[in-house]
Amino acid sequence: MKLLLTLLLGSALMCITLADECGLGTHRPVKEVIDNVRTMYYCDCRAGDAERSITVSRCDDNNQKQDDVILTYCGLEQTTGCNTNPYTAAKHDSSGDKPQFYCSCLNYKYEQSHADSRYWTIRCYMGDICD
């Protein structure tokens, strides 16, 4: 399983997304309504779930690597869920006071939008893996 995980993560450059699927029962979905128009979802670890980290790359609109971010997810199930879903929930906290809830994905690009003062959300749309 570890070898498969390594191959899946190493063979493709992953961009990040946000989705309403929280992956294999280890997370609970939370719905967030933004500007009374759009509904977004993020996922949070259930109490007692161990958080683990993984580094993934963000792509720009030209499908080029923009930067790397460290995603924190709940156990191994989060990453394996990404490869079948293809979404999996993750929490990223770059500032220490604004948690950011993402889902990593394969074969998708991302767009960024501001949800509220607590976190930034990133949503996926169909695209190619960036080089």
Swiss-Prot record:
Disulfide cysteine pairs (residue numbers): none
Residues making up the propeptide: 20-38
Gene Ontology cellular component list: extracellular region
Protein keywords: Disulfide bond, Ion channel impairing toxin, Neurotoxin, Secreted, Signal, Toxin
Tissue specificity as recorded in UniProt: Expressed by the venom duct.
Predominant location category: secreted
Function: Probable neurotoxin with unknown target. Possibly targets ion channels.
Designated name of the protein: Conotoxin Cal8.2
